[in-house]
Amino acid sequence: MSFKKIIKAFVIMAALVSVQAHAGASQFFKDNCNRTTASLVEGVELTKYISDINNNTDGMYVVSSTGGVWRISRAKDYPDNVMTAEMRKIAMAAVLSGMRVNMCASPASSPNVIWAIELEAE
């Protein structure tokens, strides 16, 4: 069994156990995103995960199957750095497993900054 298949099986099992994983964004996720100035983006298939430390483009980026690009912000202070680390793990799991994600992303910058991310059950 390939590494990608093992990761996909693990992510699917975790999604089945999770009460927050649904087809489409969960109501909890939608409600939280709607309380912000960010936009809800549902059912995104992430295909690339990029880590960049260049001065002008510093950060983590994800790319969708349709070419959309989003940035996962860095955080310097605890507990924010723990939360962004979890968002990066979810994004990486989605890329490796092929599972879709729902994102709450701020359109205030380009590329849009992900404020929240949720795995979508298949």
UniProtKB/Swiss-Prot annotation:
<keyword id="KW-1015">Disulfide bond</keyword>
<dbReference type="InterPro" id="IPR008992">
    <property type="entry name" value="Enterotoxin"/>
</dbReference>
<protein>
    <recommendedName>
        <fullName>Heat-labile enterotoxin IIB, B chain</fullName>
    </recommendedName>
</protein>
<keyword id="KW-0260">Enterotoxin</keyword>
<comment type="function">
    <text>The biological activity of the toxin is produced by the A chain, which activates intracellular adenyl cyclase.</text>
</comment>
<keyword id="KW-0843">Virulence</keyword>
<comment type="subunit">
    <text>Heterohexamer of one A chain and of five B chains.</text>
</comment>
<dbReference type="Pfam" id="PF06453">
    <property type="entry name" value="LT-IIB"/>
</dbReference>
<feature type="signal peptide">
    <location>
        <begin position="1"/>
        <end position="23"/>
    </location>
</feature>
<dbReference type="GO" id="GO:0033644">
    <property type="term" value="C:host cell membrane"/>
</dbReference>
<feature type="disulfide bond">
    <location>
        <begin position="33"/>
        <end position="104"/>
    </location>
</feature>
<keyword id="KW-0732">Signal</keyword>
<dbReference type="GO" id="GO:0090729">
    <property type="term" value="F:toxin activity"/>
</dbReference>
<dbReference type="InterPro" id="IPR010503">
    <property type="entry name" value="LT-IIB"/>
</dbReference>
<dbReference type="InterPro" id="IPR038629">
    <property type="entry name" value="LT-IIB_sf"/>
</dbReference>
<keyword id="KW-0800">Toxin</keyword>
<dbReference type="GO" id="GO:0005576">
    <property type="term" value="C:extracellular region"/>
</dbReference>
